[in-house]
Amino acid sequence: MQTTQQNAPLKRTMKTRHLIMLSLGGVIGTGLFFNTGYIISTTGAAGTLLAYLIGALVVWLVMQCLGELSVAMPETGAFHVYAARYLGPATGYTVAWLYWLTWTVALGSSFTAAGFCMQYWFPQVPVWVWCVVFCAIIFGLNVISTRFFAEGEFWFSLVKVVTIIAFIILGGAAIFGFIPMQDGSPAPGLSNITAEGWFPHGGLPILMTMVAVNFAFSGTELIGIAAGETENPRKVIPVAIRTTIARLIIFFIGTVFVLAALIPMQQVGVEKSPFVLVFEKVGIPYAADIFNFVILTAILSAANSGLYASGRMLWSLSNERTLPACFARVTKNGVPLTALSVSMLGGVLALFSSVVAPDTVFVALSAISGFAVVAVWLSICASHFVFRRRHLQQGKALSELHYRAPWYPLVPVLGFVLCLVACVGLAFDPAQRIALWCGLPFVALCYGAYFLTQPRNAKQEPEHVAE
């Protein structure tokens, strides 16, 4: 049995390639492979492309804010630490629990999605059986060591990146007739994109699905979580942010274009990945089986990143003395075992969603995760706004910041407003409205819990300035 150490620091073992692939691995998973079908069926092809373009803009704005903060203050559990310092300790506490909720709920939806993938080959085996199997695998990967986790995630993510590139190339060839359709029908060209009109249900569905789009992009902010375990963060983090954003925009927009062009909006949902539907339409032998396996790998990789993130958030809360000290204990390999074990309980959500109408519960779980991650993004933009303002008020030069978000204050303000608009969009979608009914009370509960449990003399977080 591994020994545990009280309040021991986490180890800085991640390199640039680990950080880039960790972020990509967290993003390329359940949201892209399954929720894209829901968005196409709701908004139409052109509406989906527009929604993802807006989502890409939001990600760019948030990551610029996070880049400046995490280079100035590279810490594990970055978001809630920044929020505590610049927005108030109660807000920091709430942000931490929101982000923990984001990834534990995402764990449940990821395991459910993985179960759907396995049912493609084994339709007689219940989804919950696969949930149990994958829970054990993901937990095992996380408890060995941080370096082992990072190496595993690097190769998982590399498989996904190569596959997405291949999908865009093959799908593009099928769109324009270079690869024949399996049923002998002519190449669709751009007909599916324009068949129902540019916006068949108007503009409101785009607003309604923005949280689902943001859920698909969630994971980019893992760069901030891993900053405290990264070698030379001042050099590594800016490179990772620039590289990750560029690749995500290319991968997501290219992938959504191929999906929207090849699948009519009436044929997509969440029971089967639209990616598998595409390769069933294209006459490539065994391509659907191969890609189903890749999707399975991608989803488990995203779950792997999610357990890492949620475990580190509990460790950080304990390290800041807002959770019992047991959560800050780490093994001799620097792994917060107790924090990981508690976070793994999110896998129970997968069992629930696989039993109770996975068609609707899965969408609701994604919406709750989407609400939570957008709320965290709100805090990142607000924290950056206050951080830069105080930096200037203290008479410090901008040149002292080794990574600077451009166009201040436009970037944090616009990022905050767009995230807020996405949350408002939930109120207009009955299928996702549950995110507000669950998310807002959860926020109130966190604030109440903070003021009830934290000593009065600990409620003022000392301000830290960037060195």
Curated annotation (Swiss-Prot):
One example of a Gene Ontology biological process annotation: S-methylmethionine transport
Bilayer-spanning residue ranges: 20-40, 43-63, 96-116, 125-145, 161-181, 206-226, 245-265, 282-302, 337-357, 361-381, 408-428, 434-454
Keyword annotations: Cell inner membrane, Cell membrane, Membrane, Transmembrane, Transmembrane helix, Transport
Membrane disposition: Multi-pass membrane protein
Location of this chain's protein in the cell: Cell inner membrane
One Pfam family named in its UniProt record: AA_permease
Role: Transporter for the intake of S-methylmethionine.
Family: Belongs to the amino acid-polyamine-organocation (APC) superfamily. Amino acid transporter (AAT) (TC 2.A.3.1) family.
Name of this chain's protein: Probable S-methylmethionine permease
